[in-house]
Amino acid sequence: MNTANAPAEGSVHEWKCELDKANGKWSYYDNGTAWITYTDNFWKSHLGQVVQWVGEILNKEDDMPGTSGEKCSFTECQCKVDGAGYVDAGFSAADAKSDDGSEWGCERVSGTAFNIWDKNPNT
């Protein structure tokens, strides 16, 4: 992942996070390429219990991806169940929330999609 250069406007990406239980290794992928891994023996006998899809910024002053007119869309969201394949996220309206509703918007589109945006871009 090229953290120095944000993705181009309108670009499409696939991000994935997976646990290899046999090795206790989490791998984070950007468009199919592992860009960071984390290994700890703890994960050989434990599973992740919570899945979160987050539109995140580094500093509070940074702009969140998207604007009210051009929202940033997370689509086809799924999670992998231990010993099985991927299943749809199953988002409810209550799942779409913002830490600061005066700054950042979030709306549920479907059970597998939501939009985020900065309510005050460039400020």
Predicted regions and their residues:
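Exposed, interaction-prone regions of secreted/extracellular proteins
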Residues: 1-123
